[in-house]
Design a protein with these regions (language model features):
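N-terminal amphipathic, basic-rich helices that act as targeting or association modules
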Residues: 1-80, 239, 243-245, 250-258, ...
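Long, well-ordered, tryptophan-enriched scaffold segments
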Residues: 3, 174-319
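Active-site nucleophile and cofactor-binding loops and adjacent substrate-binding regions
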Residues: 39-48, 68-72, 100-119, 142-146, ...
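Cofactor-binding active-site loop characterized by glycine-rich and histidine/acidic residues
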Residues: 41-162, 315, 332-333, 337-338, ...
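Non-catalytic terminal/interface segments that mediate subunit docking, oligomerization
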Residues: 65, 269, 277-390, 396-406, ...
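Structural signature of the thiamine diphosphate
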Residues: 217-285, 407-412, 431-480, 606-617
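Glycine-/acidic-rich phosphate or pyrophosphate-binding loops and their flanking alpha/beta elements
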Residues: 259-262, 294-295, 304, 314-329, ...
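Peripheral docking tails and interdomain loops at the edges
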Residues: 298, 302, 306-309, 419-421, ...
Length: 617
């Protein structure tokens, strides 16, 4: 096995050129085998194998630096830098991360997880290099999906002023999570499909390479490259920005990639290398279903089907269903996603109401202000977005939506702990950052029925409103009773004495388990479904304080600025002597791992909460 000869960074340079294709095949087989067991980002990594090999062959790590945008396509990089054994624990608690981690390897120079950050980070590292008088090579690898994000263009605009070398590799597979949209995607597609140019370039190069005067002719052709490209490739967008453009290059030809990276290293200034790859290359199911294999659960290699198929609906499914019903009933309801129609559950809405569906690309800031404009124009926009990604648009929520009290609905998926994707994706801050904004209403459903009811309430609410719900199976609840959603009011599920459990959203299920344990231990226990985190139901809080020895708040959110803080402030204002125990996540980033395991480790499970309450009593 060629892969057995690679134990650390730079060992790949021992591999003979004629073995590059065989090594790429071994890497793909390794990734398919391991990810079929652990789950992970398969499609993007299969598409980036040769590109990663070429970078490692053309550079010297860790002196040279590679910044991976988003970072989910860094598995081959990890494999080539001595982390082969880590794949057994990929995305497991205390195991190897699915993203680059500085603490994991000195070859990971910058932590990533969100989109469109690599060019800014790389530019900063270039400036640091120059100020320190160093000569190493800095490379940022960014996908065409990430290039739909505005931050990437802010950085490109800045990078165009560089006078020292900085390489930006555009890994163009015409996909982000779902298929790319927008003007830049159309532009890149025109470049990508300019086969006349690509074939001409490669054909001329190969024909001249073996002749006596071939190298001198090639050099002259290269000096004329800008003029030729202007004739063949429409727009020359990057060149017009002041960034040297090289490509398009076949992203699955290691030798061609090494040549172009070598050429890029000689450029004085910023240079963009346009590499065309295929997401999922080498594995037929991933090529047929690229969105499904973006982030795959463990699967059967032969069929590509999940090993543990889901038999129940999840919260995203529930949201998808209610949005389609709302679209039918309310002609002014429109839906917005930031490049994730599949992940957010809006694909069905898109198919049913294409004129009222908007995929804005990986552009959360634009998505929110675009929604504000729709609301100002008389529509009822629903922005469906993951909790960890919505935090990128905080200023737009505050300045463009809430300041004007515009009726924008934020459907916040993946709120709370999300598990295997780790620190960059845990949705544990939204209650805090949304509750800090004047005029924002924040709701959290206890189960799938309440999610539907809250969405129906939200689209008729005259102001900004957020509904946050977790990843995973949609809890049906212990009872099908559905108390009407009344603005600012909580729901008393049980009312007794001694202990009052005030649970937010997904924590209601855990609170029911805690209550059972307390009852078995002889304690009278009330249970409140908070429903509205903001505005907090102060009448309910005062009632709980008057009738109980201990109030326990429960939320999947960090402590600072969360619901527990709001209850503490209310009790202080009322000069209440009732004791308060807040069950929250710690003031820390939460690593990757199984969600239930993380809850136990962080004392958010029923047993841990029960034991702590026993201590208070």
């Amino acid at each position: 096995m060629l892969l057995d000869r690679i134990e650390k960074e730079n060992d790949i340079k021992q591999i003979a050129k004629e073995d590059y294709d065989a090594l790429a095949q071994e890497i793909r087989e390794f990734l398919i085998e391991k990810i079929s067991e652990t789950g992970g980002h398969l499609g993007s990594n299969l598409g980036a194998v040769e590109l990663t090999m070429a970078l490692h062959l053309a550079l010297t790590l860790p002196e040279d630096k590679i910044i991976w945008d988003v970072g989910h396509q860094s598995y081959t990089h990890k494999l080539l830098t001595g982390r082969r054994d880590g794949f057994a624990t990929l995305r497991k608690y205390h195991g190897m991360s699915g993203f680059p981690k500085r603490k994991e390897s000195e070859c990971d120079c910058f932590d990533t997880g969100h989109s469109s950050t690599s060019v800014s980070a790389g530019l900063g590292m270039v400036k640091a290099r120059d100020l320190r008088g160093e000569k190493n090579t800095i490379v940022s690898v960014i996908g065409d999906g990430s290039l739909t994000g505005g931050m990437a263009y802010e950085a490109l605009n800045n990078a165009s002023q560089l006078e020292t070398n900085y390489i930006i590799v555009l890994n163009d597979n015409n996909m982000s999570i779902s298929e790319n949209v927008g003007g830049i995607s159309t532009y890149l597609n025109n470049v990508r499909t300019a086969t006349g140019y690509l074939d001409l370039k490669e054909g001329v190069y190969k024909a001249l390479k073996g002749t006596s005067r071939g190298e001198s002719v090639i050099a002259k052709i290269r000096r004329l490259k800008n003029g030729v490209k202007q004739l063949v490739i429409p727009g020359m967008f990057f060149e017009e920005m002041g960034i040297t453009y090289l490509g398009p290059v076949d992203g699955h030809d290691v030798n061609a990639l090494i040549r172009v990276i070598g050429e890029a290293k000689r450029v004085k200034g910023a240079v963009l290398v346009h590499v065309v790859t295929e997401k999922g290359k080498g594995y037929a199911p991933a090529q047929r279903h690229p969105a499904r294999f973006h982030g795959a659960e463990p699967f059967e290699i032969e069929s590509g089907l999940p090993k543990n198929p889901r038999n129940t609906s999840n919260y995203t499914d529930v949201f998808s269903t209610v949005m389609c019903k709302l679209g039918q009933r309310e002609e002014n309801v429109v839906a917005i996603t930031a490049a994730m129609p599949d992940g957010t559950g809006l694909k069905r809405f898109r198919n049913m109401y294409p004129d009222r569906f908007f995929d804005v690309g990986i552009a959360e800031e634009h998505a929110v202000t675009f929604a504000a404009g729709l609301a100002a124009g008389g529509m009822r926009p629903v922005v469906a977005i993951y909790s960890s990604f919505l935090q990128r648009a905080y200023d737009q929520i505050l300045h463009d939506v809430c300041l004007q009290s515009l009726p924008v609905v934020f459907a916040i998926d993946r709120a709370g702990l999300v598990g295997a994707d780790g620190e960059t994706h845990q949705g544990i801050f939204d209650l805090s950052y949304l509750s800090s904004i004047p005029g924002m209403t924040v709701m959290a459903p206890k189960n799938k029925w309440e999610l539907s009811d809250m969405m129906k309430f939200a689209v008729h609410f005259d102001g900004p409103i957020a509904v946050r719900y977790p990843r995973g199976e949609a809890y049906a609840g212990l009872s099908e009773y559905r108390a009407p959603v009344v603005y600012g009011e909580s729901e008393w599920i049980y009312e007794e004495s001694e202990v009052a459990l005030l649970a937010v959203g997904s924590m209601v299920k855990t609170a029911e388990q805690v209550r059972d344990r307390l009852k078995a231990a002889g304690h009278a226990c009330s249970l409140v479904n908070v429903r509205f985190v903001k505005p907090a139901d102060e009448k309910m809080i005062r009632r709980a304080a008057a009738g109980h020895r201990l109030i326990v708040t429960m939320e999947e959110n960090v402590a600072s600025g969360g619901y527990g803080d709001r209850v503490r402030a209310c009790l202080a204002d009322a000069e209440s002597s009732t004791r308060l125990y807040t069950v929250t996540l710690p003031d820390a980033y939460v690593e990757h791992g199984n969600t239930e395991l993380l809850k136990r480790e962080l004392s958010l499970d029923a047993d841990s909460i029960f034991e702590k309450i026993e201590e208070y009593l």
